[in-house]
Amino acid sequence: MPPQEWTAAMAAHQSSLGRFLEAARAIPVAEWEIPLAPGKWSPAQQVEHVRLVYEVLGRELAGGQGLVIRTKWWQRAVLRFKILPGILAHGKIPARAPAPREARPGSGPFEREPLLAATLAAGTAVQRSLHERKDTPGAAVTHHIFGRLTLPQIVRFGTVHNDHHTRQLQRS
């Protein structure tokens, strides 16, 4: 990816994290722990999920365990060909896409300000790690459905993921 495109992708990702946190801060305190709909996560759980995703990505970028791939090789091949390009191009995650087990939030409660601060810190740390590795040949991270994604792919997917959860919070 040319440097200008990388810079733009990273800026878009940082902006998406800011929009997500802004949407989370706009949730009234009284609604912070209330599920958005029956069987859905609360705003607090949405934020905890995003924080956990960043935590797992950061761990993998530091050389530790990332997400566990939950699809068979042939499923990954089909999904990478049929679904992933649309997500990256159009910025929409399919409805009812499963969250990775490693990033499913507990039931809470979650203290609002410390969680928002931790999410910003985790997102910023991952962005820094991605930038440090951008010129590393073969650098990639693991997605639980699509398998190994290149750094430009994961930056874009992260932007789409943040925007996905921003829209969910704004509908509350």
For the regions a language model picked out, list residue spans one by one.
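N-terminal start-of-chain detector that recognizes signal peptides
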Residues: 4-6, 18-19, 127-129, 138
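Short, contiguous alpha-helical
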Residues: 33-88, 124, 128-172
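Short coil/turn linker and secondary-structure boundary residues
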Residues: 1-4, 27, 41, 110, ...
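Short alpha-helical hairpin
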Residues: 22-31, 93-102, 134-141
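Long, hydrophobic N-terminal alpha-helical segment
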Residues: 5-6, 12-13, 19-20, 24-45, ...
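Short, helix-capping/interhelical loops that line the mouth of catalytic, cofactor-
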Residues: 1-8, 56-119, 140
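Amphipathic alpha-helical segments that line or abut small-molecule/effector binding pockets
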Residues: 14-21, 120-127
